[in-house]
């Protein structure tokens, strides 16, 4: 399994489509990651990725705090906001924006989890968009998610695989909006595949001089090293052995790895092991000793010390604190009224 797939598996993506919209110029909407809206569609999550697939027409988008981030999108292009940050999207981004909660206020009858359909704007040229988001566990500063641009677009019609995803998502969104059985489940899986394709396209488009995790994945030698570290995280790796596996000298691999990722291979491996440990602790099915053994620690005490260095508290306390946060998130899921999706009144 390649490093991209391995990291995507670790963050446990869970996708959803919440809106199919028909917008007519002039129009502008400010999108926020609303906790109540997310709770109606997604499981509890550490991070939410927002995306918008342009089905027809065109629009502009930019981060709310960065006018220089404005990009133009045409039909067939996908807008991704990996950090779920507040962003503007519209026929122009210098218009007074309508908040998402105002736009969705008319969706009072929609049950939580169902795809909403809205029409909005001034009656000019039409733009149709499918809007969704993905929840993902981001216990550690996940190398993939933290390497992506704050806002970027991907042309979904550049190859047959991406074009198939785009057409499938359009069809599934229309089915779900018509309340066809199973439509939302299909949309969830397509959303996840859409994000994977967006990540791969982002890697392919990197300039030659780029550094960071994505550039490391693309590099012939560092990418192979990352795949080995991810696939066999429990193995007692040394830089010498890793270098032999990828076909470089020890010094050449160490330098190349550090230049691209900003840290040496063994430091990266230690952090990746803590990512695996955090995922196991969140799952709650294994003892601390079992988790320690799974990631290659010979003693629970050594594991606890390493975990504290990474997360600022021992693993038992960290798991307990995360359990409390998750319980609060699940309670919030019962009251999605802030987004305009209100629960039914008591009978």
Question: Which ranges hold each PLM region?
Answer:
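An amphipathic alpha-helical interaction segment
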Residues: 127-153, 157-228
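Residue-level recognition of short, solvent-exposed, well-ordered loop/turn junctions
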Residues: 74-75, 82
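A short, N-terminal "cap"/entry segment at the start of jelly-roll beta-barrel domains
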Residues: 1-30, 124-128, 142-160, 327-346
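Basic/polar phosphate-binding segments, predominantly the helix-turn-helix DNA-binding elements
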Residues: 193, 197-203, 224-275, 292-317, ...
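…primarily DNA-binding HTH/wHTH and HhH modules…
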Residues: 279, 286-287, 294, 301-347
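Residue at a beta-strand N-cap/secondary-structure junction
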Residues: 60, 70, 236, 268, ...
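Short helix-to-turn junction characteristic of helix-turn-helix DNA-binding domains
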Residues: 54, 229-232, 280-281
